[in-house]
């Protein structure tokens, strides 16, 4: 049978009944804890982070790794399905210029603050290895972030710039908000 006749045959109602799509259901990938399942990351971190910090770093990274496979993934799905949009005017013509975000996007913001994805690099909990710890957390978060890691990178860049070159007003007024773990002020 020529190829064009095969294509026509499969497009007929009889062919669709004989080969229904409901017989082919592919399950999506199951994501597990992004830290405990990434042996290479663990090996690299253990190589560079001193032994006195390693156990605590390992414990601290298991939490965001688990969240990346759970609630953060659900928040990201909502954020992806409902991208931010610009509302220029109210229904009465008043100028608003608001960016409207979905609950998932807002939850990603809150979780980012709670997990300290920016703050951990500035708290210096692990001394000179704090930035490495910070970047590992962001690495674990990124696949479940709906690219929320992009504004986090900009926030981190602004925080570092203010920390190194900002005047006292910026360091007092702005920096604490950029590196806050409190979602209400982050």
PLM ranges: what are they?
Residues 10-12, 16-127:
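Extended, charge-enriched "interface" segments that sit outside catalytic cores
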Residues 105-186:
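Glycine-rich flavin
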């Amino acid at each position: 049978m020529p190829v064009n006749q095969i294509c026509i045959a499969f497009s007929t109602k009889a062919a669709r009944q004989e080969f229904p799509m409901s017989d082919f259901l592919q399950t999506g990938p199951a994501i597990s804890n992004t830290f405990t399942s990434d042996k290479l990351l663990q090996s690299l971190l253990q190589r560079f982070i001193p032994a006195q910090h390693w156990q605590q770093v390992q414990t601290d990274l298991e939490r965001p790794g688990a969240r990346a496979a759970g609630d953060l993934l659900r928040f990201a799905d909502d954020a992806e399905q409902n991208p931010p949009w610009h509302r220029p005017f109210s229904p009465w013509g008043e100028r608003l210029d608001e960016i409207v975000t979905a609950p998932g996007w807002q939850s990603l913001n809150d979780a980012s603050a709670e997990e300290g994805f920016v703050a951990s690099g500035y708290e210096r909990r692990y001394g000179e290895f704090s930035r490495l710890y910070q970047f590992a957390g962001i690495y674990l978060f990124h696949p479940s972030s709906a690219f929320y890691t992009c504004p986090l990178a900009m926030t981190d860049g602004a925080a570092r710039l203010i920390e190194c070159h900002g005047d006292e007003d910026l360091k007092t007024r702005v920096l604490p908000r950029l590196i806050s773990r409190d979602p209400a002020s982050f």
